Amino acid sequence: DQSHPNAEGHKLLCSFIENLLTEAENAPDEEYTLPPAYRFGYPFMDSQLVTPEAPTAELISLTDTGSFEAVEQGTTDFPTSWKLSEGTDPLKFKATASSVFLLFKRNNSDTMGSFEVYINGAKVKTIHSNQKDGWNEPYSELAIKFQTIKDMDIEIRPAEGSEDKNITILGVAVAAQESAQ
């Protein structure tokens, strides 16, 4: 992402796309058969997403907004989000799932903060929304994936030093799939 978005990066991406289309156009027509199952199963099939506009789904529901408030985002895909306001109280959810994803806004800016994800009281991940390849876009990260389905209390807290930074959670997604790996 160091080459894009900028003028030289645009030219480079255009040449990549042009090459891809040329290769596809010149490739022999062959029918592709999908494999009967993914190698590692379907761990994220039927995922469910909650947002400020739809805070409850079958597998997950919002229980407390803490120091986060629902704000107008002004984008088509995510018109509202949970944004850290004043304080450090966690955004809380209850879920029955095997994996948890966080959808958040990231940017290449020192105004962006880090947040911690806790499952049943144990910290499982710290996510940094200040990323050098960020450009104020939605981004997702897998917080945790278990092999079995578990009841979870999920908490999202600002990391130490990020209490006054921009932390914008667009949604939380979960999936409930048993897996061997």
Where are the regions a protein language model picked out?
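Conserved catalytic region of serine esterases and O-acyltransferases that act on ester linkages
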Residues: 8-181
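Second-shell loop/turn segments in exported
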Residues: 1-8
